[in-house]
Amino acid sequence: MLSRSAIRSASRSVVAANLVRSMNRVARPALVVAGRRFASAKAQPTEVSSILEERIRGVSEESNLNETGRVLAVGDGIARVFGLNNVQAEELVEFSSGVKGMALNLEPGQVGIVLFGSDRLVKEGEVVKRTGKIVDVGVGPELLGRVVDALGNPIDGKGPINASGRSRAQVKAPGILPRRSVHEPVQTGLKSVDALVPIGRGQRELIIGDRQTGKTAVALDTILNQKRWNNGTDESKKLYCVYVAVGQKRSTVAQLVQTLEQHDALKYSIIVAATASEAAPLQYIAPFTAAAIGEWFRDNGRHALIIYDDLSKQAVAYRQLSLLLRRPPGREAYPGDVFYLHSRLLERAAKMSEKNGGGSLTALPVIETQGGDVSAYIPTNVISITDGQIFLEAELFYKGIRPAINVGLSVSRVGSAAQVKALKQVAGSLKLFLAQYREVAAFAQFGSDLDASTKQTLARGERLTQLLKQNQYSPLAAEEQVPLIYAGVNGYLDNIDISRIAEFETKFLAYLKANHDEIVSAIREKGELSKELLATLKSATESFVATF
C-alpha cells in the first residue's frame, strides 16, 4: 500500500501536468501571434534615434561632439541633432548643405533646431556645426529704401547692403530709468485717429479688427503722412518707418512697396518680409529682426515707427514650432510663453530720456480677429501689453464708414499727453457728441416722434461721422484737420446736406489757405491756437458757411 505522502505528491504532479497542458493551449497561439507581430513591427522613432546614436558613437569617437553634431531626423522645418553638447540657446548653427538654423530646444542627448530655409536640402546623418553667434542682422541708415528678408538679406534686386553695424535680433528691452514719458505726437494724418485716439512717440498702439477692415490701410497712411517732415532737414521731426510683413501674400507686399514708391515714401522706409510661403521659423524671427533695425534709430537719438503686420500670424508660426518641438500646449494649443513672446517684442518700443539720446521707437502692432472676437487668447494678450487700441469693425466698413474705427471701443492710454494742442482744443467734445449720437441713434430707429434736441443730436452726429470719413492715401496735416473738426463740433455743418460734406471740406480748406493763411501757419508752427486766432477762425467759418 502507498503511504499518504506518496499519494499527495502523485496527485500534485497530475494537477501540475494538467495546468501546464491548459497553459500551453492558451499561451502558445498568443506567443506565436506576438512573435509574428514583433517580426513585422516597425521600429519606433525613439528606437531609430537610439540606433543612429549608437552608430554615430561608433564612427565619431574621435570627432568632437561638443562643437559638431549629426542630424537624426528632419521634417516640417525642424531638425533633431545628436551632439552639439556646447551649443547655446538661440545660437545660430550651420548645416553642411549650407542651410542655417537656430537651436531652440536643448534636451538631454539631442538638440531641437529650427531651420531658416528649406528642410529638403538637409539630409539625415548630415554634419551640423556651431557658429558661436546669436542671430544678428545688419542695421543702420543704409537699409532705408530697401526690402529685406527675415534675416536682413536684401530681396529687392538692388544689390548688397553695406550696413554700418550689426545688432542681435533678440535683445533686452530698455529698463525704467533710461525711458521718459510719451510727450511728442505721431501724426497719422487720419482725422478719427489724431483727434480721438492720439498716438505719441514711444507708444505701443494696437490696430485690431477682422480681415479686410482696413488695418494695413491705417498703418500705410501713417507712413505716407511722415513725408511732409522727412523731406525736411530737421532730424528731430523726422520719423523713419519700418514695416514688417508676417505671413502675407507676396503680391500684397509687392503692391505695398509699389504704393510707397509711387508716393515717394520708400526712401525713408524699410520693409522686412516673411511671406506666407516662408518657413515658420522665419515668420517667428522677422518681427525681432525689424525691432533690431528700428532700435538703431532709437538708440542714435532719432525717431522710428515700426508696424508689425501682423502678430497673430507670428503667434501661429510660434505655435507650430512649439508643437513640433513637443513643448506642452496651453490655451488654444499655444505654448505657455506666447505672452512673453509678444511682451518682450513690444517692450522694445520706448521713448528714451534726453540723457540716453532722446530717441524713440513707436510700435503699431496689428492683430487679426475672427468674427470680431476680441476676447480670444492672442487679442487679449496684446491688448493688455499695449498702451491702447484702434478697433476696426467690419460692420462700419461695409456701411462705407472708412477708416472703420469704432470710436467707443478705441482708446489711447498715454497719447493724450502727446496730442497736438490745437487738436485737443477743438476736439475735446467730439467723442462726447459721437457717444450721445450712438445712444440716441439706437433708440431713434424704434420711434418716429422725436423732440427737437434729439433731432439736432442725430443731425450733428451724422455729419460728424461723415466728416471723419477719409479716402485712402490722402492723409491730412494737423493744420487742415483743426478747422474741419472745429466747424463740425460747433454746429456749422448742421444745416449742410450730408452729401455735400466732402465738398465743404475741400472748399473750406482752400478758402482758409487763400484768405486766412495766418491760422494755418500758426497751427503748423506752434501747434496751438491763441484766443485771437480762435476768434478769427470762428468769424472765417461763419462767413464761409453763409456763402456755401
UniProtKB/Swiss-Prot annotation:
It holds the Pfam family ATP-synt_ab. Belongs to the ATPase alpha/beta chains family. One of its GO terms (molecular function) is ADP binding. Mitochondrial membrane ATP synthase (F(1)F(0) ATP synthase or Complex V) produces ATP from ADP in the presence of a proton gradient across the membrane which is generated by electron transport complexes of the respiratory chain. F-type ATPases consist of two structural domains, F(1) - containing the extramembraneous catalytic core, and F(0) - containing the membrane proton channel, linked together by a central stalk and a peripheral stalk. During catalysis, ATP synthesis in the catalytic domain of F(1) is coupled via a rotary mechanism of the central stalk subunits to proton translocation. It comes from the Eukaryota. ATP binds at G209, D210, R211, Q212, T213, G214, K215, T216. The gene is ATP1. Keywords: ATP synthesis, ATP-binding, CF(1), Hydrogen ion transport, Ion transport, Membrane, Mitochondrion, Mitochondrion inner membrane, Nucleotide-binding, Transit peptide, Transport. This is ATP synthase subunit alpha, mitochondrial. It is found in: Mitochondrion; Mitochondrion inner membrane.
